[in-house]
Swiss-Prot record:
The lineage of its organism: Eukaryota, Metazoa, Ecdysozoa, Arthropoda, Hexapoda. This is Probable ATP-dependent RNA helicase kurz. It comes from Drosophila melanogaster (Fruit fly). The keyword ATP-binding applies. One of its GO terms (biological process) is maturation of SSU-rRNA from tricistronic rRNA transcript (SSU-rRNA, 5.8S rRNA, LSU-rRNA). Residues 170-214, 504-529, 567-612 are annotated as: Disordered. GO terms for cellular component: nucleolus.
Length: 1192
C-alpha cells in the first residue's frame, strides 16, 4: 500500500454533486418577480431554495496507474500493430490494382503465360526421341499379347506392362508441364492422345490384372477461340500503310550512303515518324540527316500524293542540298527542286522541295494548312532564326488541324546542337512532348587544345598557329575561324604571301621568261578575293612576275652542283615517326604550339625554310558576301603538292561541310549584330561564341580522320565566359515585319503566340509603336482599350511586299507622278546590305571625303538641287540604273569594279527588283511596270517627291543637326561639326564619312540606319543612308509624332470642299525632344473648336450647297458659332452641342451620322432661321447633294 500521505483526504479535492431535483420542481411566476434580474441568478445565487436539505454525493476520481510494459510485451504489441497496418495497406493496394485492372473481356483476348514456351527448349529433341522408343516398345508388347490372347497373363508379365505405362505417364507429365510446351503440338495431337488413352483399357480387357491406379497427367485446358469484341469506331487515326518506292542509285552513291551513321538508324527513325506526328531529330553535322531523311521519306511513300518540304535557313544550303539529294537519288531536278527568294526550279512534278524558311512562311499566308505537303522538315533548327521560330509555332497548331481533317501532316525538326528543352519542355508549344531521336555522327576523335592565356590579337595568334601546323604537323586541311570579312581577307593575304603557290606554267616561264595568259588570269582571280584596288592588283601581278624571274636566276645559279657529303645528313623518317616526334601527347604538343613569340609575325623568319622548299598553301576565303563561284572553290580538288587552308567566318560552322579538314584553328569569337530594343540602333560587336558553336567548330576536324582543334583561348574563359547556347535571333532583332505578317494572318494576340523562345515584351511594344507610326496599324477608337490595334488597309498592302514594312509603305505611296520605277529601284537597293564598296578609314571624322577614290564619282551622281538633297539614296538609284544598263551590254563586272560596287549585291538588287515588279503588276491592275535597262534618271521634281516618300517610310528616323551656335568651346564645336540629334537617342550621332551630304550637312535629315562602333575605350554613333528633308513636311507625313500646341486663328482655318475637311495653321513640335517646327497647315485635329468651326462652315453653306439659300435667313451670323459669347444663346448652344456630342468635324462624319439618323440637326437648324417652318425643311433633309461623295 505504501506510506499514507499527510492529510490525504483533503488532498484528494473531491467533486461534490448536489441533487437539485427538488428545486426544479418549484414553479416560479417570472412575471410576478417585478424588476428581477433573471440573468443574474445562478447556482451560487439561487432565486428560490427548497424547504428540505438537498442530498449531496461526493465523487472521488480514481487515479489509474499506467502499468509499464516489459520489453517483450512491447515488441509483441508492436508486431500486432505492424501486422494490422500491413493488412490495411494490402487492402488499399488491392483496391488500387482493381481500379486499374483491364476488363475481363479484354483479358480473355490475351494469351496466358502458361501457353508460352519458356523452358526446356534444348531437351525437346531428346524427349521426343525417348517417347518414340517407348511407344515402339509398347506396340511390340501389345502385338505379342494379341497373338496369345487366349493365354492367361501372370502377374509378373503384367507388372512389366504396368511399369511401361507408368513410365509413359511420367514422361507425358513432363511433356505436359505448363512451363514446357512443344512447338509442334496442336489440338489434333492432344485429341488423338486422349483417344489412345481411352482405347488402352478396352484392348487389355482379357488380361487378368488389377487396373493400375494412376494419376492423370496435368493437361492444358485449351480454351475455345473467343470472338474478339468489335472496337467502337474511333475518329480517323493516322494509320500509315507500308509502301516502298524503289530508288535506283548508282553503286558509288550507295556505297557512300552506307558509311553514314543515320543509315543504321533508318528503321527506328521511320517507325518513330510513322507513329508520331511531330519528331525531333538531333544529330551532329556529318551524320547525314539533311540528305538522307528526305530519301527515307520518299522511299516510304510520303511523296506519292503530296510533296516533302525541307526548309533551310540559308539559300546556299538549300541549293546545295537540292542538287546533292537529286544526285544521290538519281532523279532529275524537276522532281528534287529548290525555291529561294529570287530563284528556283520547282515544277508541277516536284516531289522533294528544298526552300528557305521565309518561302514556307509566305506559303502559309496563302495556304494555312499547307495542303500540298505531307511532311515538313525544319533543318538547322539550332540556329533559331526568326522565321524558323515562327514556323515551329505555326506548325505546332497546323499539325493537329490536319490530323482532325484526316489529312495528317508530319513535322520533323532537325538540328545539330538542339536546345531540346525549348521544345520538349515547352508545354505551350507542344502539349505532348515530341519524341527525341539522337543520331550519332560519323565522327573521329578530335583532340582539343586550349591556350594558356587568351590573346587579345587573335588574328595574329591564328596566323602563328597556322604556321606551326603547316610546318610541323602531317598532311591535312586547315580550317581557320575568324569573325568577319575584313579579317578573312587580311589573313588570306598574309598566308598567301607567306606560302605562295606557283602554278604549273612556271616551268615554261623559267625557260622563256614569259608568263602565259592563263597564269595571269588565274593569279588575278586569286588576288581578286583579297585585293579590291586595281592598282594593288597590278602591283601584285608585277610582284609575281618579279618573283618568277628571281626564281629563274636562283635556278641557274644552282645549276653548278656543289659537292655534298651524304654522311653529314640523316635519313628522314616516315609519317608515323614524325607524328610520334611532333605529337608525343596532348600536353607536349600544346606546349610546343603555345611557345610562340611575336618574331614569327615577320615574314623573314616564319618557317626557317627557303621559299623553294616550303610546301605551298592553297588558301581560300569563305564568307557570306562572297560570290557563289568563289564559295564553291572550297569543294574543288586541291592542286598537287598543296595543303588546303580555308579562312572562314561562322558560315562554315554548320551550313557547309568542307572536305579534307584535319586541323581547326578557332579564335572563339564571332561578330554579333546587337539591336537596341527601343531605338533599333544596331552595333556589330565581337563577342565570344557559345559552347555549342565551339563544339560545332571543333567537330569539323573529325570528318575524315582523327583531328585537332586549337582554341585560341583558355579553358577558364571557355567555362566562365561562354554561354551554353546562342541567344535566338527573335530575341535580338526588331520584329515589326514579323508582327505585321502575323497580324495579317489573323493572329491578333502576338504575345500569346507559342514561340519556342518568345520575344521580349519591350520588343513587341516597340514594334507595335513603329507600325502605328507607319499607318499599318490603327488604335481602336472605342472605349475598350484591351483590343489590339487593327490592321489598316495600308497594312495589308504593305504585307504583300517581301521587304521591311517601311519600304512596303514607300512602294504603296508611289502610285503617282510616275514614281513607281524609281521607288522599286530605291527599295531594292536599300534592302540589300553593302551595295557600295567603302575603302579608307570610316571612323575618323577628320578624314576628307576625297580619301575615298569612289567619292568624287558618287558626288557627281548627286550633284545639285533635289538630286543632292536626295543624298545617298540618289547614289544608289543612279548605281542601280547604270548597272542595269551595263548588265544589258554584258559589262557588269567591269562596271562594278570601276565604280566600287559589289557585283553579288547588284545581282541581288536586280533579282529583288524583278520580284517587286512582278508583285506590283500582279496586285495593281492598271500598272504595267517593267525592268527597263534604259531608265532615265528622275527629274528634279520627281527627286523632291522621292524625298517625301522616303520621309513617309522613315518618319521615326529623323535627325536634327546639333546647333553649334550654342556651344562656346571650340574643341567641342569641332568635335560636333557633323553631329546630329536623333529622336530617340540621348547621345549625338555623326554622319557617315562616305555620305554625299557630309559637306552640306543639312539642318533636318532622315537616315536609313544608325549603328555604333567602338572608338578606343568609348563608343561612337553613326548614321548612314542620309536624305535631307524640310521640317514642314513632318506635320503632313508623320503626324503621329508631332505635338500640336496651339491652333492658329490667324491665318483663319479654311474648309476644303474636295476632301470635306478643315485645315488650319498650327504651332507644333516634333518628337519627345520637342523640336520646334515652323508654322504649317494641317487638318484641324478633333476638338470642340474643330466641331464649332465645322458648324460655322455648315451654316455658311460651304459643306452642303443646298443650305446656302438659307444663309440670309439666319438669326445670327455663322461666325457666331465660334465666338465665346455664343453659349449665352440657347439656340446656338443646342446646335453646337449636337455637333460636339457626335464628334462631327468633317463632312464624312456628318454624312455617316445622317445615314444612321436622317433627322439629325433638323430641329436645331430650323431654330436658327427666321420664318422657315419645319415642314419646309423636312423635304430637303438631309441636305446632301447627290453629286457629293458619300465616302472619301
Amino acid at each position: 500500500m505504501g506510506k499514507k500521505v499527510h492529510n490525504a483526504k483533503a488532498r484528494q479535492n473531491p467533486q461534490t454533486i448536489v441533487d437539485n431535483s427538488a428545486v426544479k420542481k418549484i414553479q416560479i411566476d417570472v412575471d410576478a418577480v417585478a424588476g428581477g434580474n433573471q440573468v443574474g441568478y445562478d447556482e451560487a445565487n439561487a432565486l428560490v431554495l427548497p424547504s428540505e436539505k438537498r442530498a449531496t454525493k461526493i465523487k472521488v476520481d480514481k487515479v489509474q496507474h499506467v502499468k509499464i510494459l516489459s520489453k517483450k510485451q512491447r515488441k509483441h504489441l508492436q508486431a500486432i500493430v505492424d501486422k494490422k497496418k500491413k493488412k490495411e495497406g494490402r487492402a488499399q493496394l488491392l483496391g488500387d490494382l482493381a481500379a486499374v485492372q483491364i476488363p475481363e473481356e479484354e483479358l480473355q483476348q490475351y494469351t496466358s503465360i502458361s501457353q508460352v514456351q519458356t523452358v526446356g527448349l534444348k531437351r525437346l529433341p531428346t524427349l521426343d526421341e525417348y517417347l518414340a522408343k517407348k511407344k515402339e516398345r509398347q506396340a511390340q508388347v501389345l502385338a505379342e499379347k494379341s497373338s496369345a490372347s487366349g493365354l492367361r497373363v501372370n502377374a509378373i508379365k503384367g507388372s512389366k506392362r504396368k511399369l511401361l505405362v507408368e513410365e509413359e505417364e511420367e514422361l507425358q507429365a513432363k511433356r505436359k508441364n505448363p512451363n514446357v510446351i512443344s512447338v509442334e503440338e496442336d489440338d489434333e495431337d492432344s485429341s488423338s492422345s486422349d483417344e489412345d488413352d481411352e482405347e488402352a483399357p478396352a484392348q487389355s480387357a482379357p488380361i487378368a490384372i488389377p487396373t493400375p491406379v494412376s494419376i492423370a497427367p496435368p493437361q492444358i485446358a485449351v480454351k475455345p477461340p473467343i470472338k474478339k469484341l468489335k472496337p467502337e469506331p474511333n475518329p480517323p487515326a493516322c494509320i500509315h500503310q507500308t509502301v516502298y518506292v524503289p530508288v535506283h542509285r548508282t553503286t558509288e552513291v550507295q556505297n557512300a550512303r552506307l558509311r553514314l551513321p543515320i543509315l543504321a538508324e533508318e528503321q527506328q527513325v521511320m517507325e518513330t515518324i510513322n507513329e508520331n506526328p511531330i519528331v525531333i531529330v538531333a544529330g551532329e553535322t556529318g551524320s547525314g540527316k539533311t540528305t538522307q531523311l528526305p530519301q527515307f521519306l520518299y522511299e516510304a511513300g510520303y511523296a506519292q500524293h503530296k510533296m516533302i518540304g525541307v526548309t533551310e535557313p540559308r539559300r546556299v544550303a538549300a541549293i546545295a542540298m537540292s542538287k546533292r539529294v537529286a544526285h544521290e537519288m538519281n532523279l532529275p531536278e524537276s522532281e528534287v527542286s529548290y525555291l529561294i527568294r529570287f530563284e528556283g526550279n520547282v515544277t508541277p512534278a516536284t516531289r522533294i522541295k528544298f526552300m528557305t524558311d521565309g518561302v514556307l512562311l509566305k506559303e502559309i499566308e496563302t495556304d494555312f494548312l499547307l495542303s500540298k505537303y505531307s511532311v515538313i522538315i525544319l533543318d538547322e533548327a539550332h540556329e533559331r532564326s526568326v522565321y524558323t521560330d515562327i514556323l515551329v509555332g505555326l506548325l505546332s497548331r497546323i499539325v493537329p488541324l490536319r490530323h482532325k481533317r484526316g489529312q495528317p501532316l508530319k513535322l520533323i525538326i532537325m538540328s545539330a546542337t538542339l536546345r531540346v528543352s525549348d521544345f520538349t519542355e515547352n508545354t505551350r508549344l507542344f502539349k505532348i512532348p515530341p519524341p527525341l531521336l539522337k543520331v550519332e555522327a560519323r565522327q573521329f576523335p578530335v583532340t582539343i587544345h586550349f591556350q594558356k592565356r587568351t590573346p587579345d590579337d587573335y588574328v595574329a595568334e591564328a596566323y602563328r598557329k597556322t604556321l606551326k601546323i603547316h610546318n610541323k604537323l602531317p598532311e591535312g586541311g586547315i580550317l581557320i575561324f575568324v569573325t568577319g570579312q575584313q579579317e578573312v581577307n587580311q589573313l588570306v593575304r598574309k598566308l598567301r604571301r607567306t606560302f605562295p603557290y606557283h602554278h604549273a606554267p612556271t616551268k615554261d616561264v623559267a625557260k622563256n621568261g614569259k608568263v602565259s595568259e592563263e597564269e595571269k588570269e588565274e593569279t588575278i582571280d586569286d588576288a581578286a578575293s583579297t585585293v579590291e584596288d586595281p592598282k594593288e592588283l597590278e602591283f601584285d601581278m608585277k610582284r609575281v612576275i618579279r618573283n618568277i624571274r628571281k626564281s629563274k636566276k636562283k635556278f641557274l645559279a644552282q645549276m653548278a652542283l656543289p659537292k655534298i657529303n651524304l654522311d653529314d645528313y640523316k635519313l628522314p623518317g616516315d609519317d608515323t615517326e614524325a607524328d610520334m616526334h611532333e605529337q608525343p601527347d596532348e600536353d607536349d604538343e600544346q606546349e610546343g604550339l603555345e611557345e610562340d613569340n611575336d618574331d614569327e609575325l615577320g615574314l623573314e623568319d616564319e618557317s626557317g625554310m627557303g621559299s623553294g622548299q616550303r610546301q605551298p598553301l592553297w588558301v581560300l576565303p569563305l564568307y557570306s558576301l562572297l560570290s557563289s563561284e568563289k564559295q564553291n572553290r572550297i569543294f574543288l580538288p586541291v592542286p598537287d603538292g598543296c595543303r588546303l587552308c580555308v579562312v572562314s567566318t561562322n558560315v562554315a560552322e554548320t551550313s557547309l561541310t568542307i572536305p579534307h579538314i584535319k586541323y581547326v584553328v578557332d579564335c572563339g569569337r564571332q561578330k554579333t549584330r546587337l539591336y537596341d530594343k527601343l531605338t533599333g540602333v544596331s552595333a556589330f560587336v565581337v563577342t565570344y561564341t557559345s559552347k555549342a558553336s565551339a563544339d560545332q567548330r571543333a567537330g569539323r576536324a573529325g570528318r575524315i580522320s582523327a583531328g585537332h582543334c586549337y582554341r585560341l583561348y583558355s579553358s577558364a574563359v571557355y567555362n566562365d565566359c561562354f554561354e551554353d547556347f546562342s541567344q535566338p535571333d527573335i530575341q535580338k532583332k526588331p520584329v515589326e515585319d514579323l508582327m505585321l505578317q502575323m497580324r495579317c494572318m489573323g493572329i491578333d494576340r502576338v504575345v500569346h503566340f507559342p514561340f519556342p523562345s518568345p520575344p521580349d515584351q519591350v520588343q513587341l511594344q516597340a514594334a507595335e509603336r513603329r507600325l502605328i507610326v507607319l499607318g499599318a496599324l490603327e488604335v481602336a477608337k472605342t472605349e475598350n482599350t484591351d483590343l489590339p490595334p487593327a490592321v489598316t488597309r495600308l497594312g495589308h498592302v504593305i504585307s504583300r511586299f517581301p521587304v521591311a514594312p517601311r519600304f512596303g509603305k514607300m512602294l504603296a505611296l508611289s502610285h503617282q507622278q510616275n514614281l513607281l520605277p524609281y521607288t522599286v529601284c530605291l527599295v531594292a537597293a536599300l534592302s540589300v546590305q553593302e551595295v557600295l564598296i567603302e575603302t579608307g578609314v570610316q571612323r575618323d571624322e577628320d578624314v576628307a571625303p576625297g580619301a575615298n577614290r569612289f567619292h568624287r564619282k558618287r558626288q557627281s551622281w548627286a550633284a545639285s538641287g533635289n538630286y543632292q538633297l536626295l543624298g545617298d539614296p540618289m547614289v544608289l538609284l543612279r548605281a542601280v540604273g547604270a548597272a542595269e544598263y551595263a548588265g544589258s551590254q554584258g559589262r557588269l563586272p567591269e562596271f562594278c569594279a570601276a565604280n566600287g560596287l559589289r557585283q553579288k549585291a547588284m545581282s541581288e538588287v536586280r533579282k529583288l527588283r524583278v520580284q517587286l515588279t512582278n508583285e506590283i503588276n500582279l496586285n495593281v491592275s492598271d500598272v504595267e511596270l517593267g525592268v527597263d535597262p534604259e531608265l532615265k534618271p528622275p527629274t528634279d521634281a520627281q527627286a523632291r517627291f522621292l524625298r517625301q516618300i522616303l520621309l513617309a517610310g522613315m518618319g521615326d528616323r529623323v535627325a536634327r543637326k546639333v546647333p553649334l551656335a550654342d556651344i562656346a568651346d571650340k574643341e567641342e564645336r569641332r568635335r560636333l561639326k557633323y553631329a546630329y540629334n536623333c529622336a530617340d537617342m540621348e547621345e549625338p550621332a555623326f554622319l557617315h564619312v562616305s555620305s554625299v551630304l557630309r559637306q552640306k550637312a543639312p539642318e533636318w535629315v532622315i537616315y536609313q540606319e544608325a549603328y555604333e562602333l567602338q572608338n578606343g575605350d568609348s563608343t561612337k554613333m553613326f548614321i548612314r543612308g542620309i536624305t535631307a528633308i524640310e521640317p514642314e513636311w513632318l506635320l503632313l507625313y508623320v503626324p503621329l509624332l508631332c505635338n500640336i500646341r496651339e491652333v492658329r486663328e490667324d491665318p483663319a482655318p479654311r474648309f476644303d470642299k474636295t476632301s470635306g475637311k478643315i485645315f488650319c495653321h498650327v504651332d507644333a513640335t516634333f518628337g519627345k525632344s520637342g523640336w520646334e517646327l515652323p508654322l504649317g497647315e494641317v487638318e484641324m485635329p478633333l476638338s470642340e473648336k474643330a466641331c464649332c468651326y465645322f458648324g460655322m462652315f455648315l451654316l455658311d453653306g460651304e459643306v452642303c450647297s443646298r443650305l446656302a439659300d438659307f444663309r440670309s435667313k439666319l438669326k445670327s451670323t455663322p461666325a457666331s458659332v465660334i465666338k465665346s459669347w455664343s453659349s449665352m444663346n440657347n439656340k446656338v448652344l443646342r446646335f453646337k452641342r449636337a455637333l460636339i456630342t457626335k464628334q462631327i468635324h468633317n463632312r464624312q462624319a456628318l454624312i455617316d451620322q445622317w445615314n444612321s439618323d436622317p433627322h439629325f440637326l433638323l430641329e436645331e437648324y430650323q431654330n436658327l432661321l427666321y420664318d422657315v417652318a419645319l415642314s419646309e425643311l423636312t423635304p430637303l433633309w438631309p441636305p446632301v447633294d447627290k453629286k457629293e461623295p458619300q465616302r472619301q
